[in-house]
Amino acid sequence: MLKNKLGINNPIELAKEEERITKTKAIELFKTKKLETFEVGTFKGLSQIHKYLFEDVYEFAGKIREENISKNNFRFASAMYLKEALNKIDKMPQSNFDEIIEKYIEMNIAHSFREGNGRSTRIWLDMILKNEINKVVDWSKISKEDYLLAMERSPVKNIEIKFLIKNALTDKIDDRQVYMKGIDASYNYEGYNLYNAEDLENKN
């Protein structure tokens, strides 16, 4: 279980509080327009997102991981070479849809942080799409099963994730409802679905 700032030793309780706290922070990113002050398409920008979301829960928020990690028998970039990999990703082009998704896939393979990579990187991807092609993803249109399978295959076959994302693009780039539904969908991909973004916003 991950060491946390909340002093929680129960993994179920930690997951619950992590979702509540970080989803609330994700809402704040949109409402306060803080997101618009972050770098677009760089690891620095991704780190800024991750730090903002997770700084109340984990000491490692925004910091490059020092451990090797894997998921479903897939080993992400070695911690030893992670900084070098991130430098290469920073230099990847992002001027059109294909380039942007290819960059996103590489950032996912890097998996820069100990926890919270997917949720942070999907926000990062939307920032690039918005900045470069005036679109964002309506994540609520992509099912959890389709997304996870396509991302699992993406290092060797990116056509599936490109197809899913292209079909979910919208020009409602500043739409509150698209963002809120997207946050809920993004968290659901990772198994966090106890809280609804709309309800959390209304409580604050």
Where on the chain are the PLM-derived regions?
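FIC/Doc superfamily catalytic core
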Residues: M1-N204
